[in-house]
Structures are given as C-alpha cells and as structure tokens.
C-alpha cells in the first residue's frame, strides 16, 4: 500500500508557482531533499541553492538518512499522525536565541507546519536530473559542515557564514548577499 506522493506533490506545487521564467530553487534545511522532485517537474528551473540543507537522497526516505535517535524521537512526540512544529522538537525552544526579535520570531513560529508523520517514511524520487543542474551551497551553521564539504567535493561553489541555521530570518541582508554571490557564480542573478 502506497501513501500520498509527498515529494511529487510539493515539487508540482512549487513548479506551478515558479515556472514561466528561469528561476533558482533556494532549499533550506530539510527542503534539500525535495530537489529531485522539483527538478523532475520544473521546466524553467536553472539551478539549485542549498542553504544549511540536507543534500538530496534520491530513492530513499528521510528516515534512511537521518540519525536514528532523531527519527525515533519524532515518532514519540507525534500527535494525531502529525509531527510537532520544528521549534518543539528539542528540549528547549531554540528560536528565542536564534531570532531575538519577538515579532520576527512570532511570525516564523506561526508558520511552522505540522507535517504528516508519513512524510518521514516517504521515498524521494530516484531521478538524477537535479545532479546535472548548476548548484551551490551556503553553510550557515557548523551542524551542516558535512553537507558543505560534500558540496565542495562535488565541485559546487560553497560559501560558509559563521552564523546559525535561521540566519535568513535574523540576518536577512547578510544571507541575501551571500545567496546573490552564489547565484552569480552559477550564472544566474
């Protein structure tokens, strides 16, 4: 029995909103895993910018790539078959330290989804078209150094900022400047 196509559905919705002119996908955190699904359906996608993100895991589920302790923890804290908002996955909410501005933090937290638990076990499309697109990596936090090193190994432009995972909210100008620089290195602005 196969459940909903989480990856294909997200890819189709993004492509429907963005196609019509050349565009770059900016993929943050777990959204990096959606690159194959987006690439499979987006006609005008010209490149990928990964921002403190996991790299694609085509043909595998998130649970096959994530630390087993994290996957087990998320299963324990799931209610009504939905994951809790990201900021509650931890012993204490990290957002006050990462987003000091109360209004910006409230806006961010207010938009955090409660994703279906089934998404964790959904298999990402096995396509490889994403690997043929120009790509770059922006590392914001040390937690994503392994991914940045892998991106560098692939020959992608990599930029490392010494900040934190949610810097696009608390330091948007700095992150935007780094993204613009990386986009230019791919030949897109």
Regions found by a protein language model. Give the residues of each.
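Active-site catalytic motif of lipid deacylating hydrolases and related acyltransferases
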Residues: 1-21
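Flexible "cap/lid" loop of the alpha/beta hydrolase fold
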Residues: 40-88, 119-120, 124, 148, ...
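Alpha-helical elements of Rossmann-like donor-binding domains used by nucleotide-donor carbohydrate transfer enzymes
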Residues: 9-16, 37, 94, 107, ...
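Conserved alpha/beta-hydrolase catalytic His-Asp/Glu region
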Residues: 83-129
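Gly/Ala-rich beta-loop-alpha elbow adjacent to hydrolase catalytic centers
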Residues: 26-35
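Conserved alpha/beta-hydrolase fold motif
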Residues: 25-26, 48, 137
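Glycine-rich phosphate-binding loop signature in dinucleotide/nucleotide-binding domains
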Residues: 17-22, 42, 182-189
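Conserved serine/cysteine hydrolase catalytic core
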Residues: 7, 113-178, 186
